[in-house]
Amino acid sequence: MVRDEIEALVARERPGWRVADVVEVNDESGPTFEVAVERGDERRTLLVSADERIVGERR
């Protein structure tokens, strides 16, 4: 999964939000991505799985 794919996922699943940063995290379950997204003054972190699903969100 590359940044372009993550940006497309965020655009589809979280309209109005933009990707600010992407960090790849590898653990025993395989690669996942911590994705910082922004909308105005709001900022959140999404956890995205390698199979292109948002599996968690932190405010």
Regions of interest found by a model, annotated:
Residues 42-59:
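A short, surface-exposed beta-strand/turn
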Residues 28-38, 42, 50:
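Conserved histidines in hydrophobic membrane contexts and catalytic metal-binding motifs
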Residues 24, 34, 57:
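Acidic-residue sensor for enzyme active/binding pockets
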Residues 1-24:
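Short, non-transmembrane alpha-helical segments in secretory-pathway proteins
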Residues 6, 10, 35-37, 48:
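Hydrophobic aliphatic residue packing
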